[in-house]
C-alpha cells in the first residue's frame, strides 16, 4: 500500500506563491502551466522543472512534497540531530518517515554596482527511494545530501510513498515534531519570515524569479527570489542595536542613579506586586523579618528573587487560582496610617488568607528545596540572637590599643562579711546587745 502525504489535509497551505487553480508553487519548483492573470499584473512566463537557468544554479528535476528550507546566514551547516529532520505529513506513518534533504544551488543575481551575487542554497526533502537520489542507499556520502529518518523507520528499504504530481497535489508546508532543533541560520519557506515588506518588493521579487522574462525594469529592481538576502541577519542586528542605542558586546552597568530608579519603581507598586532584587532588598519591600514575616535570611535577604536558590522555591508558589480557591480568605478593614491628617482619609482593607502548599519527597529537587527552606525559615531568630550579643568595644580615636580599657572597667566595692558569708564567734559586746533587745520597751517620762 502506497501512502500519499497530506491526503487527508490537502487544504492546508502556507504563504507561498499560489496560481489561479489553487496549486501551491515554490520559486524554484514551478510546473508548465498556462499564464494566469492576477489583479492587473501582466502574465509572467513560468519556469519549468527542466528549463535551464541562464544565470547559474541547478534545476530541481523532481517535485518535493514539502516547502524548502532556505539558508540566510553564510557558514552555517545544514544538519539535524539523530532521529530528527523528517517533516510531518498527515497520512504517512512513522515507519515511512525516512529520506534525505537535497541541496538546491540557486541562481545568482546582479547587484546595483554590477557585481554578481550568488543566492544561498535551498534544501528540499525527498522520501527514501524518490527524488534525484532515488537509487542511492541511505547514509551514502554524497555532497549536498543530508540523510534523516525517525527512530521507528527501517532505512534498509525504500519508503512506500508516491511521487508528487504538481497538477493535483499541493506542496505541504514544512513542519517538524515538537522538540526538533532546526539548523541555525536557516528558515522554512512559507513560514512568513521571508515575506516581502511591501507590494513593490513582492512584485520585484516575482520578476526576479521568472527566468524567461526578457523585459525588466532597470537593474535596480532585481532582487533575490527570496525576500531574505544573505546579509539581512546582520542588518537586522545592526538596526536593533541602533534602535536600542546599546552595544550587545558590553554588559549593562547599573549605576547608583539607575539602582535608585529601579528601587523607586518597585516601591511604587502595590505591596503584593513587588519583587525584591539586588537594587530593592526584601526588607525595603516588605519590612524586617519577624513572627509574621519569618522567611528569609543571609544572602536571600540581600538578593531577593535574584538569589540562585529562589527559582526552585518559586516552583512551590501557588497559582492565582490556587490562591483564591484553595485558601481561607477573610476581608478586614484596617486603620489607614498613611497620609497627612489634612488629607481625605481612604478606606483600607486587607484580604487575609490562610492556606498550605503540600508536596512530598517525589518532587523534583526535593532535597534542595528542604535545604533552602530550613536555612530561611525563622532565620531572623538566629540573627536576633547574634545582634543581642555584647558588641566588641570600639576604640576611640586618638587612643592606642590597650589605652582607656582600664578606664571603662568598673571596680566593685569589697564585699561585707555578711556578703562573704563567713562564720565568726559572738563577742561579749554582741551578747550584751542581744540581751537589751530582749528587754521590754519602757517610755522615758523624766522631765528636762
Swiss-Prot record:
Keywords: ADP-ribosylation, Host Golgi apparatus, Phosphoprotein, Ribonucleoprotein, RNA-binding, Transcription, Transcription regulation, Viral nucleoprotein, Virion. Residues 259-384 form the CoV N CTD domain. Its main location: virion. Packages the positive strand viral genome RNA into a helical ribonucleocapsid (RNP) and plays a fundamental role during virion assembly through its interactions with the viral genome and membrane protein M. Plays an important role in enhancing the efficiency of subgenomic viral RNA transcription as well as viral replication. This is Nucleoprotein. It is found in: Virion; Host endoplasmic reticulum-Golgi intermediate compartment; Host Golgi apparatus. One of its GO terms (cellular component) is host cell Golgi apparatus. It holds the Pfam family CoV_nucleocap. Residues 266-384 are annotated as: Dimerization. It comes from the Viruses. It comes from Bovine coronavirus (strain F15) (BCoV). RNA binds at residues 106, 122, 164. Residues 1-55, 157-231, 385-448 are annotated as: Disordered. Residues 52-194 are annotated as: RNA-binding. CDD domains: CoV_N-CTD (cd21595), CoV_N-NTD (cd21554). Residues 9-22, 193-223 have a biased composition (Low complexity). The lineage of its organism: Viruses, Riboviria, Orthornavirae, Pisuviricota, Pisoniviricetes. Residues 422-439 have a biased composition (Basic and acidic residues). Residues 29-38, 45-55, 399-409 have a biased composition (Polar residues). One of its GO terms (molecular function) is RNA binding. ADP-ribosylated. The ADP-ribosylation is retained in the virion during infection. Homooligomer. Both monomeric and oligomeric forms interact with RNA. Interacts with protein M. Interacts with NSP3; this interaction serves to tether the genome to the newly translated replicase-transcriptase complex at a very early stage of infection. Belongs to the betacoronavirus nucleocapsid protein family. The gene is N. The modification Phosphothreonine is found at residues 174, 427. Residues 61-190 form the CoV N NTD domain. The modification Phosphoserine is found at residues 167, 191, 390, 423.
Amino acid at each position: 500500500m502506497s501512502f500519499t502525504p497530506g491526503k487527508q489535509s490537502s487544504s492546508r497551505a502556507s504563504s507561498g506563491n499560489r496560481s489561479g487553480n489553487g496549486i501551491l508553487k515554490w520559486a524554484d519548483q514551478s510546473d508548465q502551466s498556462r499564464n494566469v492573470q492576477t489583479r492587473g499584473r501582466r502574465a509572467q512566463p513560468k519556469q519549468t522543472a527542466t528549463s535551464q537557468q541562464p544565470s547559474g544554479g541547478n534545476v530541481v528535476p523532481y517535485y518535493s512534497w514539502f516547502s524548502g528550507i532556505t539558508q540566510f546566514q553564510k557558514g552555517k551547516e545544514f544538519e539535524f540531530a539523530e532521529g530528527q529532520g523528517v517533516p510531518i505529513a498527515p497520512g504517512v506513518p512513522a515507519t515511512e518517515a525516512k529520506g534525505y534533504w537535497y541541496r538546491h544551488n540557486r541562481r545568482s543575481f546582479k547587484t546595483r554596482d554590477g557585481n554578481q551575487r550568488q543566492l544561498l542554497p535551498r534544501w528540499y526533502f525527498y522520501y527514501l527511494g524518490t527524488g534525484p537520489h532515488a537509487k542511492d542507499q541511505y547514509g551514502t556520502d554524497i555532497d549536498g545530501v543530508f540523510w534523516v529518518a525517525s527512530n521507528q523507520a527501517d532505512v534498509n528499504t525504500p519508503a512506500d510513498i508516491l511521487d508528487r504530481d504538481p497538477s493535483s497535489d499541493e506542496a505541504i508546508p514544512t513542519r517538524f515534531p515538537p522538540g526538533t532543533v532546526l539548523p541555525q541560520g536557516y528558515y522554512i519557506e512559507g513560514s512568513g519570515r521571508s515575506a516581502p515588506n511591501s507590494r513593490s518588493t513582492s512584485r520585484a521579487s516575482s520578476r526576479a524569479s521568472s527566468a524567461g522574462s526578457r523585459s525588466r525594469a532597470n537593474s535596480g529592481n532585481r532582487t533575490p527570489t527570496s525576500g531574505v538576502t544573505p546579509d539581512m541577519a546582520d542588518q537586522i542586528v545592526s538596526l536593533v542595536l541602533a534602535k536600542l542605542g546599546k552595544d550587545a558586546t558590553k554588559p549593562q552597568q547599573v549605576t547608583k542613579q539607575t539602582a535608585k530608579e529601579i528601587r523607586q519603581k518597585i516601591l511604587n507598586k502595590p505591596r503584593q506586586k513587588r519583587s525584591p532584587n539586588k537594587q530593592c532588598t526584601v526588607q525595603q519591600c516588605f519590612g524586617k523579618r519577624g513572627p509574621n514575616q519569618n522567611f528569609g535570611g543571609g544572602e536571600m535577604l540581600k538578593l531577593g528573587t535574584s538569589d540562585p536558590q529562589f527559582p526552585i522555591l518559586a516552583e512551590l508558589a501557588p497559582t492565582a487560582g490556587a490562591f483564591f480557591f484553595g485558601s481561607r480568605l477573610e476581608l478586614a478593614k484596617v486603620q489607614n496610617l498613611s497620609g497627612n491628617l489634612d488629607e481625605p482619609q481612604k478606606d483600607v482593607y486587607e484580604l487575609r488568607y490562610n492556606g498550605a502548599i503540600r508536596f512530598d519527597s517525589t518532587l523534583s529537587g526535593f532535597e534542595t528545596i528542604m535545604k533552602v527552606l530550613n536555612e530561611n525559615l525563622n532565620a531572623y531568630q538566629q540573627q536576633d540572637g547574634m545582634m543581642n550579643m555584647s558588641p566588641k568595644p570600639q576604640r576611640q580615636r586618638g587612643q592606642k590599643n590597650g589605652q582607656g580599657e582600664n578606664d571603662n572597667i568598673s571596680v566593685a566595692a569589697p564585699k561585707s562579711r555578711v556578703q562573704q558569708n563567713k562564720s565568726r564567734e559572738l563577742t561579749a559586746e554582741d551578747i550584751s546587745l542581744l540581751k537589751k533587745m530582749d528587754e521590754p520597751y519602757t517610755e522615758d517620762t523624766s522631765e528636762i
